[in-house]
């Protein structure tokens, strides 16, 4: 969970919170290197202020009558007892058009169940603050978004996928 009340953004001024899954340190460090590459090579900074994560509930505005503690309590009471924990896996890099470059998390029913349970708990704690996305859920870990220069996505994806091959070779 991240509270972004102190940050202002011209694109999303009313969004104060999102809920995501943090990743193990080794994966986080590798993906921070990917973010650094995108910043150094293309000047990308959008999305780099948040920790590396898989989003479960996208950014939303939490009304003042509710608190982050209300959300945490709801997740603790409604989601944790369901024992929805599992091990996720990353398979390569991909993109949503020319807008978002991401590490592709292998989607399965466990990710969907976790996302649905967390969204339900948030809506129970703070009705109307967000809504379940109607699109199919694609868990992913954004490396860069919104400020990727036009025409560079193919080259950036090639570099990211080569990096993945180097990581696999060094672990094998």
Report the location of each language-model feature.
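Extracellular/luminal beta-rich ligand-recognition
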Residues: 96
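Basic, often amphipathic N-terminal segments
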Residues: 1-87, 108-169
């Amino acid at each position: 969970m991240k509270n972004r009340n102190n940050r202002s953004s011209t694109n999303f001024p009313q969004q104060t919170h999102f809920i995501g899954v943090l990743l193990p340190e080794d994966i986080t460090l590798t993906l921070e290197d990917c973010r650094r590459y995108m910043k150094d090579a293309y000047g990308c900074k959008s999305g780099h202020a948040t920790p590396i994560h898989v989003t479960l509930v996208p950014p939303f505005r939490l009304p003042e009558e509710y608190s982050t503690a209300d959300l945490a309590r709801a997740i603790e009471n409604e989601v944790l007892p369901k024992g929805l924990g599992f091990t996720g896996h990353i398979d390569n890099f991909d993109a949503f058009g020319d807008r978002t470059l991401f590490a592709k998390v292998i989607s399965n029913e466990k990710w969907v169940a976790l996302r649905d349970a967390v969204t339900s708990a948030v809506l129970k704690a703070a009705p109307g603050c967000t809504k379940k996305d109607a699109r199919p859920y694609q868990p992913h870990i954004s490396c860069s978004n919104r400020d990727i220069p036009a025409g560079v996505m193919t080259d950036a994806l090639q570099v990211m996928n080569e990096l993945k091959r180097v990581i696999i070779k060094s672990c094998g």
